[in-house]
């Protein structure tokens, strides 16, 4: 595969979902990525961007993008707006029940646009 074909294939694996400015620091928004609801979460301090599954396994609702963004002992997290369980934004692990986790996605910013990798990360990878 030549270099141009590799670049084209990689572009297909990433979905352009919105402008970085569409996600204010300290908030989340929902985006559709490869047919799945993904919560894009931007922390305020430090300014960082994360992508996790939007489905809250405790309330059985697609609400995590509307959660409370913050940190717990330095761990960036989002708390479900329903029952308040917190999820590590880096790993998807529930900070209140380590047996539960939500999918996480690679995310990057290019020319002011947020791109999300179409497949969730495998557990144990970054």
Give the residues covered by each predicted segment.
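Short cysteine clusters
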Residues: 56, 80-83
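N-terminal pre-ligand scaffold of iron-sulfur
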Residues: 1-75, 88-89, 101-126
């Amino acid at each position: 595969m030549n270099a141009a074909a590799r670049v084209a294939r990689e572009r297909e694996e990433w979905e352009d979902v919105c402008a970085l400015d569409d996600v204010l620091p300290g908030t989340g928004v929902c985006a559709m990525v490869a047919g799945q609801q993904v919560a894009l979460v931007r922390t305020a301090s430090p300014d960082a961007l994360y992508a996790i599954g939007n489905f809250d396994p405790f309330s059985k609702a697609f609400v995590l993008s509307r959660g409370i963004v913050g940190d717990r002992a330095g761990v960036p997290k989002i708390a479900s707006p329903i029952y308040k369980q917190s999820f590590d934004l880096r790993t998807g692990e529930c900070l209140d029940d380590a047996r539960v986790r939500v999918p996480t996605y690679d995310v990057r910013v290019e020319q002011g646009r947020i791109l999300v990798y179409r497949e969730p990360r495998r557990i144990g990878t970054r």
